[in-house]
């Protein structure tokens, strides 16, 4: 029996859970349940990520303490996870004594080995709010192209990256005040000292997905930098211990103590389980799972989003190795969620909160749909509402549940719920049993979409068998009563096997199926067992079809969520940003039609797409725009795409912009994308029928 500890990334305690979050928690939960079903001892822990400036500011805006703020959000998160059947063994908070003790211990060990250094850092400071400003709280004019209202790290217009101190006419988005430069002593974790270790660690077989490992090699080539692990007061978090007396308090940056939260949640669970004799909740040893000398005894896996690979595959293993703790056995990254082919949108009603979805639709619908889309690759998945409705209705209602519903009626009506004493089709049942090995392997390898396809193939065989035997016709013929019972017994047994295979994805459905089948066990090992001479209970509908009206109501409610729940903090930030604008700017929200017609949008095809050496946010494109010579375009989308993802794609390019000289060359156009450069950009691609060189009108 393998001993496995599993974590999901910690949701930030600053707002509700939405469907984008749920991709990860559903993926992890399915994997955990699948491994538990195969009799492994698996422990799944998580916690709220409860520190940082954003939480401090939101609490202030809401008129509560940070502790009250995070307690309210934690309760909301736990309620949402419960609705979606996420089966944590423990759900904790990074604002805990366990996390404080472990964070301080790791820091002290790193410091004791000389892995911590200090240096003075010049930062922008908000004189009205009395705090140093992170890049996201500073806006101004791009130092390269002059575009207004650009964030403090990169320009959304020309793609240039820069330091916040380089912005022209900067202002604080928190107060509207003009920030001033101040110097502060910061503490750094010397990541370059672990470069040799990390180069090997990231190449170890099974540690990372190949695409992630390849991405990390690029970062190694660019050179690792020391990591700033401190923040100045005021800050909601843990004070850094052992700082020189008389110096201002320093706090751990949220990304230092957040991953330590995995350890803290597990340690908290170990305390809860101390002395336990319950085999379902066994006693656990913290040291067995976290000490370096025990890393071959137990396994540790992190499920994360692709946007936080840098922290989990570089900083985190280096911190652990430098403080005498074991490193993860594997770090598994997933892509982002798209809805109807686009980034989630509040205005379109596709930025859907977990609570809103559960109000209108069975959460297990989403669990199945995500499972049907997820693979072991780092790929975005698309929740297409039409496909979602069709797949759930066809696969789950029309195929799987239909096997039971079309057979159970005969068994109840004609045989008082009793199944046949023998199996009329042993080879068919054995075929379904044999499929279990491949399904189990697909689950373990996180190839959930493959597992769902294999399960649906089994369901198809069951329905084909029923259709070929036609028990409804047999039932009308005198003397064929035994045949009807035999056919329905085979169907019910296949249904039982399918419930074994679907249990990790649909735990509530399988619990209801247990009640119908009058059994207690649907573990993976039980797939060999047959229900013969066994009495089942009266069938009740196990899953309802999705109606378009339910989806429409959910989307409408999501739009109302946008209108009804703007946070006080969001209002304050919006007002602060507006304070720096002139009345003229506020009156110029509209442009003339003639101005719009000046923009030349052209169908372009990507001939080449490459990384830009020395630019961590740019991709370089060679585009065919239907003219004699292709054009060169730089686009700030590197963190959202690998070059090969865009090869040969047809895109929209603004082709009458004045060429812009940049550090890396001349950009002769602009590729159109949708979304937020902070969280995810989606390049707008066109169907093959669009002709290169055509203009959009």
UniProtKB/Swiss-Prot annotation:
Gene3D superfamilies to which the protein is assigned, alphabetical: HUPs, Isoleucyl-tRNA Synthetase, Domain 1, Methionyl-tRNA synthetase, Zn-domain, Nucleic acid-binding proteins
Quaternary organization: Homodimer.
GO cellular component, one term: cytosol
Official protein name in the record: Methionine--tRNA ligase
Keyword Cytoplasm annotated: yes
HAMAP family: Met_tRNA_synth_type1
Catalyzed reactions per annotation: tRNA(Met) + L-methionine + ATP = L-methionyl-tRNA(Met) + AMP + diphosphate
Binding site for Zn(2+): 142, 145, 155, 158
EC number: 6.1.1.10
Motif ('HIGH' region): 11-21
GO BP terms: methionyl-tRNA aminoacylation
Keyword tags: Aminoacyl-tRNA synthetase, ATP-binding, Cytoplasm, Ligase, Metal-binding, Nucleotide-binding, Protein biosynthesis, RNA-binding, tRNA-binding, Zinc
Cofactor note: Binds 1 zinc ion per subunit.
Cofactor: Zn(2+)
Predominant place of localization: cytoplasm
């Amino acid at each position: 029996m393998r001993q496995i500890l599993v974590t999901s990334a910690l949701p930030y305690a600053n707002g509700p859970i939405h469907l984008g979050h749920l991709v990860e928690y559903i993926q992890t939960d399915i994997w955990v349940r699948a491994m538990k079903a195969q009799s492994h001892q698996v422990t799944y822990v998580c916690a709220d990520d409860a520190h940082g400036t954003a939480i401090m500011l939101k609490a202030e805006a809401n008129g509560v303490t940070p502790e009250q703020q995070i307690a309210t959000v934690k309760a909301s998160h736990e309620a949402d996870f419960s609705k979606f059947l996420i089966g944590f063994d423990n759900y904790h908070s990074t604002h805990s004594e366990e996390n404080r003790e472990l964070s301080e211990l790791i820091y002290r060990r790193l410091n004791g080995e000389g892995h911590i250094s200090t240096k003075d850092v010049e930062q922008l400071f908000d004189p009205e709010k009395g705090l140093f400003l992170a890049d996201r709280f500073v806006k101004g004019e791009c130092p390269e192209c002059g575009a207004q209202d650009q964030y403090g790290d990169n320009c959304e217009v020309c793609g240039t990256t820069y330091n916040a101190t380089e912005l022209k006419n900067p202002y604080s988005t928190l107060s509207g005040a003009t920030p001033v430069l101040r110097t502060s002593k910061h503490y750094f974790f010397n990541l370059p000292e672990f470069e040799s270790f990390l180069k090997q660690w990231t190449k170890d077989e099974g540690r990372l997905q190949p695409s992630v490992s390849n991405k990390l090699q690029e970062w190694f080539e660019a050179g690792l930098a020391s990591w700033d692990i401190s923040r100045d007061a005021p800050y909601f978090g843990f004070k850094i211990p052992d700082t020189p007396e008389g110096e201002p308090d320093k706090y751990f940056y949220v990304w230092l103590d957040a991953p330590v939260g995995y350890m803290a949640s597990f340690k908290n669970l170990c305390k809860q389980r101390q002395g336990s004799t319950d085999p379902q909740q066994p006693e656990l040893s913290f040291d067995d799972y976290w000490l370096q000398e025990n890393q071959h005894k137990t396994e540790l896996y992190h499920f994360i989003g692709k946007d936080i690979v840098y922290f989990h595959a570089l900083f985190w293993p280096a911190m652990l190795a430098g403080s005498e703790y074991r490193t993860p056995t594997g770090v598994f990254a997933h892509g982002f969620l798209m809805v109807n082919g686009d980034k989630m949108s509040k205005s379109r009603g596709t930025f859907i909160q977990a609570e809103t979805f559960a109000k209108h639709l069975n959460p297990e619908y989403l669990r199945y749909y995500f499972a049907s889309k997820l693979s072991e690759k780092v790929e975005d998945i698309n929740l297409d509402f039409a496909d979602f409705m069709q797949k759930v209705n066809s696969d789950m209602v029309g195929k799987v549940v239909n096997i039971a519903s079309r057979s159970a009626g005969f068994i109840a009506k004609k045989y008082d719920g009793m199944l046949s004493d023998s199996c009329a089709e042993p080879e068919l049942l054995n075929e379904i049993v044999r499929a279990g090995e491949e399904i189990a392997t697909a689950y373990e390898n996180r190839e959930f979409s493959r597992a769902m396809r294999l399960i649906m193939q089994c369901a198809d065989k069951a329905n084909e068998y029923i259709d070929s035997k036609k028990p409804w016709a047999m039932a009308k013929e005198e003397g064929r009563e035994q045949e009807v019972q035999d056919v329905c017994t085979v169907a019910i047994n296949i249904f039982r096997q399918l419930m074994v295979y679907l249990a990790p994805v649909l735990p509530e459905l399988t619990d209801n199926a247990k009640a119908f089948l009058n059994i207690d066990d649907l573990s993976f090992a039980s797939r060999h067992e047959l229900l013969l001479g066994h009495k089942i209970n009266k069938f009740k509908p196990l899953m309802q079809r999705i109606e378009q009206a339910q989806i429409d109501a959910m989307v409408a409610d999501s739009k109302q969520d946008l209108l009804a729940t703007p946070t006080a903090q969001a209002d304050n930030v919006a007002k602060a940003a507006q304070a720096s604008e002139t009345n003229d700017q506020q009156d110029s929200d509209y442009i003339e039609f003639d101005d719009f017609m000046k923009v030349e949008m052209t169908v372009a095809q990507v001939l080449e797409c490459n990384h830009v050496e020395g630019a961590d946010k740019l991709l370089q494109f060679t585009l065919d725009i239907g003219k004699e010579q292709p054009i060169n375009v730089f686009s700030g989308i590197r963190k959202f795409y690998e070059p090969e993802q865009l090869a040969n794609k047809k895109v929209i390019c603004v082709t009458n912009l004045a060429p812009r000289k940049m550090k890396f060359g001349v950009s002769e156009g602009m590729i159109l994308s949708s979304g937020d450069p902070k969280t995810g950009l989606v390049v707008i691609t066109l169907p093959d029928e669009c002709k290169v060189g055509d203009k959009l009108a």
